[in-house]
Amino acid sequence: MTSCFSRYLISEKQVRQHYANAEVKPKVTIIKDDTLSLSIASIGADTLPMLLLIHGAPGSLWGYMNLMDDKDLQKHFHIVSVDRVGYGKSRLKKRKFVTSIETQAKALLPIFALNHSEQRVTVLGRSYGAPIAAKMVSLVPDKVKELIMVSPVIDPDKEKFYWFSKWGRNSFVQLFLPGEFNTATAEKYSHSDELKKMLPVWQNIHVPTTVIQGGNDWIADPENLDFARKHIKSKRAQYIFLHNAGHMITYTHASMIKEMLLKSLLFQDKITALDVKGQ
């Protein structure tokens, strides 16, 4: 089972090896109070506009290394990638995991205090991190410049389960699985109900919003894009369907993501890194 999701889990050893000879390395810090610990990695001057990256399930803040390592993005953004509660060293009240989308979103709000620029924050969430990003944006819309959801799992009627899903709930099997995998399983089995709670939220999102979905995504049903079109009421929204893309769009279409982030007029300029066939 773990091999199915190994690409989403990055060990500390792999991180050390990756940055062993790097000239610029992310700064890893812990935001902590009496009940909350948030592990974050940041790179770029903190006086630059913040780009906040929220991972899926399972996942890690290091799942965005390719974006954090991009020199052009480093020059223009204070890039902050966070371990959601239940992943890495991020915890809330010593709980192993938190399945509530609202609680997850509220737990991330202290990160906004790290924004020392005069501009609002760009929030990017992918997969299971997308609805958490959206909920967070709905809580502090005045602090957010734009919302980008990549391969979002947001339709409560399109939750996918696999042959191995039920085994992930077995307490004996869980003893041999990475903690992040068990956290993801807990999230998955409550996700549809949590997404139903999100239904009234979508109409309250009015910041510029971009939704990107792949046609060959085996985790997020492509119809999640139709759900977004129907429920998001922002007049400044765009929807991008990549016919041949899978789930890992932030890797396979990194140049497109990068160009989107660097565009100062996101909703007026054409995204040239995307070819006319939507590949």
What do the PLM-derived regions correspond to, one by one?
Residues 57-69:
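The serine-hydrolase catalytic nucleophile loop
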Residues 66, 221-230:
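Short alpha-helix in the alpha/beta-hydrolase fold that links the catalytic acid
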Residues 73-91:
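Conserved alpha/beta-hydrolase
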Residues 103-120:
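Conserved acidic catalytic loop of the alpha/beta-hydrolase fold
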Residues 131-134, 138, 147-173:
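Flexible "cap/lid" loop of the alpha/beta hydrolase fold
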Residues 205, 211-213:
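Short beta-strand/loop motif that positions the catalytic acidic residue
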Residues 216-220, 247-248:
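Acidic catalytic loop of the alpha/beta-hydrolase fold
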Residues 245-254:
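Catalytic histidine-centered segment of alpha/beta-hydrolase-like enzymes
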